Amino acid sequence: MAPDSGPFPDGQLLKLLPVDPRDRDTQRCRLGPAAFRSLGARLGSPLRISLPAGGCCLCTAWPRRDRVDGFVQLDPQCASPGARVATGRIGMDCLQPVPCPPLRRLEVWPVLRPQAGAPSSAAVLEVVHELLRNRPVSRGHVVTTPPGVPGPVAALHVMGGTPDPEPGGWVTPHTRITLSDKPPPQVEPPGEVTLGGLSETADSLRELLRLPLRYPLALAALGLAVPRGVLLAGPPGVGKTQLVRAVARETGAELLAVSAPALQGSRPGETEENVRRIFQRAQELASRGPSLLFLDEVDALCPRRGGPHRAPESRVVAQVLTLLDGIHRDREFVVVGATNRPDELDPALRRPGRFDREVVIGTPTLKQREAILQVITSKMPISSHIDLGLLAEMTVGYVGADLTALCREAAMCALLKNEKNQDSPKIEETDFLEAFKKIQPSSFRSSTGLMDIKPVGWEQIGGLEDVKLKLKQCVEWPLKFPQEFARMGLTQPKGLLLYGPPGCAKTTLVRALATGCHCSFVSVCGADLFSPFVGDSEKVLSQVFRQARANTPALVFLDEIDSVLGSRSVGTSGCDARERVLSVLLNELDGVGVRTVERRGSKASQQECQEILSRSVMIVVATNRPDVLDDALLRPGRLDKIIYVPPPDQEGRLSILKVCTNNMPVGPDVSLENLAAETCFFSGADLRNLCKEAALFALQENGLEATTVRQEHFTEALKTVKPSLTLKELTFYENLFKKGLSNLEDD
């Protein structure tokens, strides 16, 4: 249905409506009959329109399909740089017919897409002719390429022509189009760019780039060598590309961004030719002012050399090294490479004189995630009840791209939930909780170990109150109350050992610990580690800790550690795989395995207590055979806290039975107190199995219509479910606790 018509609402004002989808990328302006008559325009007449949000665009006049006055719709495909179409009202005096004589010659500056590589001038001109065919253009305006149109060109800057296309000119089939050799003046005006969570890294990169680009002669006079190449390393999605573009914009440098895989050619020598062409183009830009060449995914272009079948890659690496060595002649030329696999780069590329400096962007910390969320949600209608600090705590391991996807999914949930109120949707906390189910951290994908857990609350574990308190003191309290711990001179333990009889909820306690801490959780078992190949198990364990350090705060859980690690004092001869895995674990606990590329951030004195503690990695191990563990693992500084998880006493068994029967229709004749007294030597797993068997007996007796579990069903279940613990085992653990490990356990 057409909107209500009128001559001109609010006097001589036209209401600006969104462009008709059928008019996208046509450069058309839809007007009513009265506006046509007022302007004296004809069908297809060029119009120069001043936009209410700033800037102007060049369109052709076309009548509205519903012939309603008082409204205007336009497609700003040819507009001034930075122009933006926003809803509002514009006056009739903002619409001016302009003459557009046919152009004999037109000069443009193409803006290439990042993945375009180094296309030839003929390929670029072919796309330019197709894009500008039979269109009006204006000097200083930018013509954008429609989305989905293939080709290397993203946009065109109109530089000039004959006759001068100011205020307008018409491109005809006879117009001779050439590519300008001079870039447009200040295509992107410098200004501070909001980089959520990257301000510290941006400052480091900005200082590295600003000095050689702005003060090359002064540095040469002082005899200082400035870096010619900078390598950005970090996981995918942290914002490496965005950071380089923002810093180049702020420093006023001309940015030439290239995706390294796009330079790969199919025929021999084509890749080297593309690389030379890109460097030549960057040096031409440097001859006119500061220039920055950005090579994204540089590891695809310069992999580690070696092997008989890698001759083509070796030639490409040699070509890049030669070109990097020749940069010193251009004082206003800097190369920036980005990779998420720095270890795959050829070592010759990472020496001084080529990539002199390396800037590491790690997975965002707590404060950085909060800053990123503030930037992303600044233009979103979020509820005032949403605590971004709490969201930042819940998004451990999320990079900038993950947080963007999370907010986008939350917005979609809000939109679908409020379909009837789409004019003013509001994003609530429930929308973010729903989005958490669909958006997982990208850094957890394709990783060793279980990265996600089914949430378990402390209240779902019956008994063991002393053990729960000790676990909270060791892990939860340092993360939630860092200032109090710092005031008392306390530090978080490096490692925790849980030992006790089987079935006493050791693994469930760790799951509850990970649920309450909002930290990354990595669970590793023996099957994940052991491999038939020599050295593979140690490599996997190192990778687990590297992954955990990249997603701090992190909790690494090694279940049944006695089956994973060996002891150098009992029953082994020589150096088997288990002893080598033990050696790697000891080194990781001591911090020997931390690589330089994983360190990030500033000095600890410049960080808040919470930010420091949230960078920690804690290991929790569980076993029912602590007597076979190596003594070096049990000393303070490695597994600082050793906690005995005892079998439940009568009070603990009663608490466990209450938890197990919480969702079970138990009859009034059932006495949980008597059951707790009759189940001596039952572990927590045995009690849960007992309740399940009683429920099954109720179904067997009364059929599928059964509604109650009575005392007789529990009595029958006691005849089949036997305790898994024996007096001998309990005596063994009690003696072990009192004699063998008492010096490390503070009871």
Swiss-Prot record:
* GO CC, any one term: nucleus
Going by the UniProt record, its keywords in alphabetical order are: Acetylation, ATP-binding, Cytoplasm, Cytoskeleton, Hydrolase, Nucleotide-binding, Nucleus, Repeat, Ribosome biogenesis
- Matching SUPFAM superfamilies: P-loop containing nucleoside triphosphate hydrolases
Q: Name one GO biological process term.
A: ribosomal large subunit biogenesis
Q: Where in the cell is it found?
A: Cytoplasm; Cytoplasm, Cytoskeleton, Spindle; Nucleus
Q: Name one GO molecular function term.
A: preribosome binding
State what this protein does.
ATP-dependent chaperone part of the 55LCC heterohexameric ATPase complex which is chromatin-associated and promotes replisome proteostasis to maintain replication fork progression and genome stability. Required for replication fork progression, sister chromatid cohesion, and chromosome stability. The ATPase activity is specifically enhanced by replication fork DNA and is coupled to cysteine protease-dependent cleavage of replisome substrates in response to replication fork damage.
Q: What is this protein called?
A: ATPase family gene 2 protein homolog B
Give me the gene this protein comes from.
Answer: Afg2b
